[in-house]
């Protein structure tokens, strides 16, 4: 009876197990703890334990002191329990106990535990003595029991009576499992549990301090975070990816996921000492790239931390009880995220209503040798822009003035998604970068990430040495047949300007962090920005003419690029964007491009053009980006299959073309492009023959290669797996003999394989060996794993993990082999992109009202019936065409006047856009057009200030005008809109007249000058050969005093002497009371000016009559004044 009672007590929870912060060794006890989370439940539990621990007559001797309770055997992980000292009464009682324990004649009560340790030679007392001893023992036990209960009560008061007792209970029951890793083995979970804190020495009721001991997982996260403090870490933990600390808060905000509160800082700051775990958030494994893309799109730098060990290999290793080894495997930013076939903006990013397309360029910039100050400041700037997704590299070195117009022009052309600034840049440059990248509504259409790196005083020498060693290492890895090309490559790179070399070195180091430094091997695509083979469109021109995005919504709809974009492929679209921003200057090249567009337009219904259209429509993947992902070794198996099959489709379509003459077109440009397509056919077919198409499509790495192409390592591991599976099949016979059955079959349940199923009611249940482990069961059957099967399954899993590693290694080898063919593959894709652009321009040319332009050698714009290309497509009504005639031999400038909202700005933009379209190689919206080779288009339109630089609207206006006067040439087109309006009338007229005269007389560039100063029309009289003509936008007056006007939007000869600003005020719904006053004041001022002019005319006439000298010149001036009246 005593033994059974003792065993029963061993199964009961002890007081110390409740108050001590212990770790449960089973899920059942953990759940029981978690359920008791209130004061009432805690008290109930104490009462239950008191009743359960009441001593029986046989077992009273077991209850010595509370310090000696040891009824429940310890769990796998011992946790120190708090030892709370008692007050004076308890101390005295304990002293009595000690005295009793030191008594030489103390008799220990018998129990199941102490019975066998009693000395057999103990003297036998008489019955009387024995009876008195029993009574004494009972008295002592009664007193001890009373003290024990009092001690228990004191513990209860100390534990629960203080402030915050309920949170303490809840925390104590749940904190131990807060940071264990889901999906990992039990050993690691136990290792990562918190350890109970040491007992507090504070007064009763003091709040218990949180544990500061870090789990192994937390230590791993902190170590990696310290190396990458600027990145948001996504940590693989079992079957989830988790965020910790501040990263979890940011991820929860950006991804709209739940963040469990906790510590945000990684430096163990005292302000978070009351928290014992990190804040955390989690996402499923299969949604990793979805959420990473969202974080990257928001401008964050994201690091992915993966487990480097698998469960099978870890279980077989020596560190099976250690946490999983983790390492940062990938870093992503907006410019370096190429691990997905879709772009960050999505497949339909460049739709009608989308933002302007991002180019994906990373731009590195350095600045040096600042000279002068104020308006005379000059800086030397070097830039290098890399597009990791395509391999394109742009570099330039130039000097810029205080307005930083050169930097702005390059930034607007390149449209980077990420900046890397080297060293300290000037204040003006820094503010320009902030202005262009600081918000989601900037000119790039999205927020831009900016990173900064330091620059030493010996940066030039260090950069040259670094770049030399980088390319020297590349040259050693090349074959002997490529040595000459490699040397040319190195010479080309080392001859770059010094500041560009500094940028190149910094960019190599930057991209090495993302494993993308191999992009610099592709130096064929190093291109200088400022090559004079293209028309220059500066930053103001790109914005004012809406080349890439409109000025209203900052989207691509309504831009010139949107108008011309009819491409079918993403790589064709990128090439067209480059064409739009860099119109040609070579007349012969331009003629070839337009001839190709004409042939495709005229042959639209022919089979050969239809074949091209069909081919382009079948290309659904971005081959240019996919090819570079192959080059980086980041391509997936299904993606590789798609690339190879698409290239095979392209090459097979024109496999009959052996030379450009076989293509069948008249245009040499088209024939040359088509002849590049079948070149890759043999290589593509050879690679396709190496892989299993069905396995590649299903992303099955184990059977990806054909059997004849598998490596020895793959074959060895497959044989090992086959051997183990054979042994598993053989064990079925052994199992059948054990169970005395004819046949045993394995079953799979809940994903667990090789289970042996036995009916519960059968005789075989009695024959199951004790070593067989029961895995699962139902009322009818039980399922077991014999130890032999478990060992074989473990061996099979190890072979599978080794096989997976061998398959990945072989796949990377295949990607490296394909990378050696990068150049011909890239040429094939580039040729298809060129054909896509030609087809797009042919689709534009096929629209009604578009005509092929004629090109002239001199600077000339002769357009009849021209229309605005974008406004025409957006308007529901018919666009009113206009004529333009400008040339170096005739009229070089037009002074455009007219009422507000009369169409002046639309007209001058129309002229510039037709010129740009013509030099892109496109048809233009006109009845006829003869265009010269313009080297640049400059614009000064709109009014805005630069508060950050302390520059007023008028200052910005004149600064931009100054840059135009310095850069314009006789082959440039210059558009100036209302120059001088930002100051007084007299100063504005003087400045406008001086600038216009300088443009026409000295620079002799083609000029369109918009003004409301009617006095400027007199300047045309100073050019007797008609170099400057006055034109105006026509309108008709109606209503009382001509207050109602109708815009005709036609260009006519002469000057408009009124601007009709009050009519615009009425259209803007200015209150009628204000308009009435404005009309009165306008009439008064107009009458006053007329009287003043009449007085001047009268005095002039009197001088003529009196003197009679210079009569012709004076009379001409008087007639002009009369005409203005």
Swiss-Prot record:
Residues 1-212 are annotated as: Disordered. Its main location: nucleus. PROSITE patterns: DNA_MISMATCH_REPAIR_2 (PS00486). One of its GO terms (molecular function) is ATP-dependent DNA damage sensor activity. Residues 135-145 have a biased composition (Basic and acidic residues). Heterodimer consisting of MSH2-MSH3 (MutS beta). Forms a ternary complex with MutL alpha (MLH1-PMS1). This is DNA mismatch repair protein MSH3. The lineage of its organism: Eukaryota, Fungi, Dikarya, Ascomycota, Pezizomycotina.
């Amino acid at each position: 009876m005593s033994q059974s009672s003792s065993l029963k007590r061993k199964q009961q929870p002890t007081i110390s197990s409740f108050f001590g912060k212990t770790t449960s060794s089973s899920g059942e006890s953990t759940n029981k703890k978690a359920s008791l989370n209130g004061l009432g439940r805690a008290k109930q539990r104490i009462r239950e334990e008191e009743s359960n621990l009441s001593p029986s007559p046989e077992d009273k001797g077991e209850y010595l002191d509370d310090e000696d309770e040891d009824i429940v055997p310890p769990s796998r992980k011992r946790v120190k329990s708090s030892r709370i000292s008692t007050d004076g009464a308890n101390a005295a009682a304990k002293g009595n106990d000690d005295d009793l324990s030191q008594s030489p004649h103390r008799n220990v009560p018998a129990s199941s535990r102490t019975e066998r340790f009693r000395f057999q030679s103990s003297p036998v007392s008489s019955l009387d003595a024995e009876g008195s001893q029993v009574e004494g023992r009972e008295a002592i036990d009664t007193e001890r029991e009373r003290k024990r209960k009092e001690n228990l009560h004191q513990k209860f008061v100390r534990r629960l009576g203080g402030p915050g007792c309920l949170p303490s209970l809840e925390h104590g029951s749940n904190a131990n499992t807060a940071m264990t890793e889901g999906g990992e083995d039990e050993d690691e979970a136990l290792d990562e549990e918190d350890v109970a804190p040491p007992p507090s020495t504070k007064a009763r009721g003091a709040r218990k301090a949180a544990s500061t001991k870090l789990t192994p997982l937390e230590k791993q996260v902190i170590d990696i975070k310290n190396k990458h403090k600027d990145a948001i870490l996504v940590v693989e933990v079992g079957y989830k990816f988790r965020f910790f600390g501040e990263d979890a808060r940011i991820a929860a905000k950006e991804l709209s996921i739940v963040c469990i509160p906790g510590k945000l800082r990684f430096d163990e700051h005292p302000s978070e000492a009351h928290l014992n775990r990190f804040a955390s958030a989690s996402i499923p494994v299969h949604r990793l790239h979805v959420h990473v893309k969202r974080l990257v799109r928001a401008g964050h730098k994201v690091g992915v931390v993966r487990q480097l060990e698998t469960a099978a290999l870890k279980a077989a290793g020596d560190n099976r009880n250690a946490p999983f080894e983790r390492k940062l495997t990938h870093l992503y930013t907006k410019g370096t995220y190429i691990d997905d076939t879709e772009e960050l903006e999505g497949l339909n990013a460049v739709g009608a209503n989308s933002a302007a397309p991002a180019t994906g360029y990373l731009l590195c910039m350095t600045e040096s040798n600042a000279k002068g100050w104020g308006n005379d400041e000059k800086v030397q700037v070097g830039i290098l822009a890399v597009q990791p997704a395509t391999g394109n590299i742009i570099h330039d070195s130039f000097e810029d003035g205080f307005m930083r117009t050169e930097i702005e022009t390059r930034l607007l052309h390149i449209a980077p998604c990420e900046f890397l600034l080297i060293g300290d840049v000037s204040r003006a440059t820094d503010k320009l970068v902030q202005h262009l990248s600081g918000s989601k509504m900037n000119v790039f259409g999205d927020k831009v990430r900016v990173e900064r790196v330091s620059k030493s005083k010996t940066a030039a020498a260090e950069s040259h040495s670094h770049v030399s060693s980088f390319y020297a290492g590349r040259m050693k890895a090349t074959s002997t047949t490529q040595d000459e090309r490699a040397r040319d490559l190195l010479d080309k790179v080392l001859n770059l300007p010094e500041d560009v070399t500094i940028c190149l070195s910094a960019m190599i180091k930057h991209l090495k962090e993302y494993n993308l430094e191999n992009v610099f091997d592709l130096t064929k695509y190093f291109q200088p920005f400022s090559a004079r083979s293209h028309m220059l469109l500066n930053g103001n021109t790109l914005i004012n003419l809406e080349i890439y995005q409109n000025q209203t919504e900052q989207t691509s709809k309504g831009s010139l690029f949107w108008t011309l974009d009819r491409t079918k492929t993403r790589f064709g679209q990128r090439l067209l964007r480059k064409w739009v921003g860099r119109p040609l200057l070579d007349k012969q090249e331009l003629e070839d491009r337009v001839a190709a567009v004409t042939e495709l337009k005229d042959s639209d219904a022919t089979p050969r053009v239809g074949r091209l259209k069909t081919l382009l429509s079948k290309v659904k993947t971005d081959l240019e980006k996919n090819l570079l992902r192959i080059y980086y070794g980041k391509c997936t198996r299904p993606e590789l299959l798609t690339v190879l099959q698409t290239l095979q489709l392209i090459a097979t379509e024109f496999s009959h073309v052996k030379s450009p003459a076989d293509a069948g077109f008249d245009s040499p440009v088209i024939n040359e492009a088509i002849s590049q397509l079948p070149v890759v056919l043999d290589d593509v077919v050879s690679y396709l023959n190496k892989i299993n198409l069905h396995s590649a499509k299903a992303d099955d790495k184990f059977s990806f290669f054909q059997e004849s192409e598998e490596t020895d390592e793959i074959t060895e591991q497959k044989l090992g797996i086959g051997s183990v599976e054979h042994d598993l099949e053989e064990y079925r016979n052994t199992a059948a003999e054990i169970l005395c059955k004819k046949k045993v079959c394995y079953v799979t349940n809940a994903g667990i394989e090789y289970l042996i199923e036995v009916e519960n009611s059968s005789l075989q249940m009695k024959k199951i060996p004790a070593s067989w482990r029961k895995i699962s069961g139902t009322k009818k059957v039980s399922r077991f794993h014999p130890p032999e099967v478990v060992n074989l399954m473990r061996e099979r899993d190890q072979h599978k993990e080794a096989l997976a590693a061998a398959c990945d290694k072989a796949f990377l080898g295949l990607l490296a082999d394909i990378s050696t063919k990068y150049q011909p593959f890239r040429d094939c894709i580039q040729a298809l992109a060129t054909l896509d652009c030609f087809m797009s321009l042919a689709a534009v040319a096929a629209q009604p009202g578009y005509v092929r332009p004629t090109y002239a050698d001199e600077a000339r714009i002769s357009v009849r019936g021209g229309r605005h290309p974008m406004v025409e497509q957006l308007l529901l009504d018919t666009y009113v065409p206009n004529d333009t005639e400008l040339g170096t031999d005739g009229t070089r400038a037009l002074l455009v006047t007219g009422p507000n909202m009369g169409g002046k700005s639309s007209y001058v933009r129309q002229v510039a856009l037709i010129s740009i379209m013509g030099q892109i190689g496109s048809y233009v919206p006109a009845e006829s057009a003869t265009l010269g080779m313009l080297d640049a288009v400059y614009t000064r339109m709109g009014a805005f200030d630069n508060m950050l630089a302390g520059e007023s609207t008028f200052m910005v206006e004149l600064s931009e005008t100054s840059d135009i006067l310095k850069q314009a040439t006789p082959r440039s087109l210059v558009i100036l809109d209302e120059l001088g309006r930002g100051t007084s009338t007299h100063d504005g007229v003087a400045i406008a007249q001086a600038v216009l005269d300088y443009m026409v007389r000295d620079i002799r560039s083609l000029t369109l000058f918009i003004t409301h100063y009617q006095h400027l029309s007199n300047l045309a009289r100073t050019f007797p050969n008609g170099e400057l003509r006055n034109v105006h936008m026509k309108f008709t007056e109606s209503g009382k005093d001509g207050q109602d006007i109708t815009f005709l939007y036609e260009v006519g000869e002469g000057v408009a002497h009124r601007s009709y600003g009050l009519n615009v005020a009425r259209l803007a719904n200015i209150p009628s009371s204000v308009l009435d006053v404005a009309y009165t004041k306008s009439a008064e001022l107009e009458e006053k000016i007329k009287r003043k002019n009449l007085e001047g005319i009268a005095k002039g006439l009197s001088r003529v009559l009196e003197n009679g000298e210079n009569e012709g010149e004076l009379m001409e001036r008087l007639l002009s004044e009369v005409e203005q009246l």
